[in-house]
């Protein structure tokens, strides 16, 4: 290539074209280019010395030089036609890339999905290892660059399979990420022809040990001779463990007889773990040291339009992603779900090309299962003519039914306003598409959703009224004023409600009390966006209030109706826990009618089963309420009678005095995303920890909480596993604390559950999650997020059911 030559690009702002323009400029060539719009990509080229010409005009074509065009440039383009008239050399983008790579060690990445990420990861590793590679990548890095000419022999580039340009390349190293029904319109609709093209490309690699392919992709198996990578055991580069930790991935793999443990990747999603594995394989093949590989992956800054954050608000998150094929959409949403947990995901999808939508229609309908809501907007045609496809409204309806989400069609021009009206605090929005959907995120960069109106309900009719107030006073200080407008409701011991200005100690909560159905209270509750009950005992955490809020159609925090009711029934809890193999303390249930009719028979059965001391416990009260330690028959009979004053059901339980009390906290939805804390221990002065000692009432020293336990890792793992079993079998939703006894032999026995555990300053629930690295504010956020999720799931099922009924009726 003659360095005196001038290169003119028709469409210089395109991602592939601009990368090559960068390389030419870095190598000292003169470059000009035209495009319809000027953005950051062209600004970077101008800064290097390129001449930018807006729009397309015949006069832009130089008298001498080489004209570069891409597959997207139509043959009737005025500059293309003028170049033909002037008989100037016309070179396709792919041909220029092949020329630029001549006499260099070319590392080319091809495949239907993931090319940009894999090539970017390889580049990052080589840069960290000080190899200074050249690169041409289909996405902008953190410096807004996609092309660069380095000083070394290495040249890393994407090899686009979509337009037949693979024939121009002769790679030293090849990576094939996968093969899908993508770009089939360029292969006469034949996936087989696409596969043959990929196969021919890999055959150009002289050494099979320099050809890497995805061994989990069925379409590639048996076609390619090389090094397979993936999650299957038969892969030569075998990823044998992976997990996602928030916005990062951690994985381990084996390659060439060596294990590489706990690699930290600054990307999310199983698909990106596979992408990173391919990059690792290439790097190791070239002898790059493990330390450089690990550092590059850990600090990888990502690629723009790949899970890129677009907004500044801390109340919600707006991401942009290039995913536009159903497989990409599905993988992206799955990774996002694992990162954000129970937060509502709103996917804004702009289908890209009518032909892709037609070829992938069935997959498209099922691609959104990890979203909560989908906004479907108009197809970005990319120059194609419309095809015979269902209407946008019909597409949205089918997505709703197939992906089990609420999907709504919104015309492109209305999307921004629709989002402004519907985005809620804690939402995660993600735009999906390769067209101009990125404008939505730009428009919402500084948008702030309105704060949630949260009503804190506390007090209650139970004997734990005072503890509820203490818990509420502690929790409300962590309700962020940037996220929430908070109102306070106190229920007195008679069940009457009052709305108060604050929960300060010494406030008079009894001056203006109303029935919950009074207009004053009902109207105040109706205006709330969310209710946060912080109530202990009957009428608070037993499903009663939860049922009322369900009827009122209000989202609420803490346990669900069913979970509350079961958890506060200690007998039912024991039965369900035992059904999944969780050891429960031996017990014998007793009902009031049975006790009234046959007290002697009841006593005889108890004495035949248990020895003194034993415990009499109420079935539906708190963990330390209505619990009596008895030592003889007289005490037993008296305390059973007393227990029936507080509850309709009681049970006798074998004593576990001398055992340690180990407790574990839970938060989230047991059916999807939940968190289990590390165990803590509650220690009293002696024996059973009663209500007064538990909370330090009436002058008693409160029981102490020990977080750094003298327990083996095996025991800690065991109690957490038992906790998880209990939480899942009772379908935990919201929050709870699960209590166990640990006997002298090292056996754990389920004691009980507390669906709304104490949250006072000294209570362990908040501290349990704080010790996992959360702030108290984040924990309270999570209580609200879990409540919103619980409400959204029920609403989604209800709306889908009603819609399906309507469709059935119409048919």
Swiss-Prot record:
ATP-grasp domain residues are 574-785
Q: InterPro entries given for it?
A: ATP-grasp (IPR011761), ATP_grasp_subdomain_1 (IPR013815), D-Ala_lig_Van_CS (IPR000291), D_ala_D_ala (IPR005905), Dala_Dala_lig_C (IPR011095), Dala_Dala_lig_N (IPR011127), Mur-like_cat_sf (IPR036565), Mur_ligase_C (IPR004101)
Q: List the disulfide bonds.
A: none
Q: Which residues bind Mg(2+) 1?
A: 739, 752
**Alphabetized UniProt keyword annotations:** ATP-binding, Cell cycle, Cell division, Cell shape, Cell wall biogenesis/degradation, Cytoplasm, Ligase, Magnesium, Manganese, Metal-binding, Multifunctional enzyme, Nucleotide-binding, Peptidoglycan synthesis
Q: Which cofactor does it need?
A: Mg(2+); Mn(2+)
Pfam families, sorted: Dala_Dala_lig_C, Dala_Dala_lig_N, Mur_ligase, Mur_ligase_C, Mur_ligase_M
How many cofactor units bind, and how? Answer: Binds 2 magnesium or manganese ions per subunit.
Q: Which domain of life, per UniProt? A: Bacteria
GO molecular function per UniProt: ATP binding; D-alanine-D-alanine ligase activity; metal ion binding; UDP-N-acetylmuramate-L-alanine ligase activity
Subcellular locations according to the entry: Cytoplasm
Please give the catalytic activity noted in the UniProt record.
UDP-N-acetyl-alpha-D-muramate + L-alanine + ATP = UDP-N-acetyl-alpha-D-muramoyl-L-alanine + ADP + phosphate + H(+); 2 D-alanine + ATP = D-alanyl-D-alanine + ADP + phosphate + H(+)
* Record: residues binding Mg(2+) 2: 752, 754
PROSITE patterns in the record: ATP_GRASP (PS50975), DALA_DALA_LIGASE_1 (PS00843), DALA_DALA_LIGASE_2 (PS00844)
Q: In which pathway does it act?
A: Cell wall biogenesis; peptidoglycan biosynthesis
Q: Which GO terms describe its biological process?
A: cell division; cell wall organization; peptidoglycan biosynthetic process; regulation of cell shape
Q: Give the span(s) annotated as D-alanine--D-alanine ligase.
A: 451-811
Q: Which residues bind ATP?
A: 111-117, 607-662
Q: What is its EC number?
A: 6.3.2.8, 6.3.2.4
Segments for region (UDP-N-acetylmuramate--alanine ligase): 1-450
Any GO CC annotation of this UniProt entry: cytoplasm
Q: Which family does it belong to?
A: In the N-terminal section; belongs to the MurCDEF family.
Protein name as catalogued = Bifunctional enzyme MurC/Ddl
Organism whose genome encodes this protein: Chlamydia caviae (strain ATCC VR-813 / DSM 19441 / 03DC25 / GPIC)
Q: What gene is this protein a product of?
A: murC/ddlA
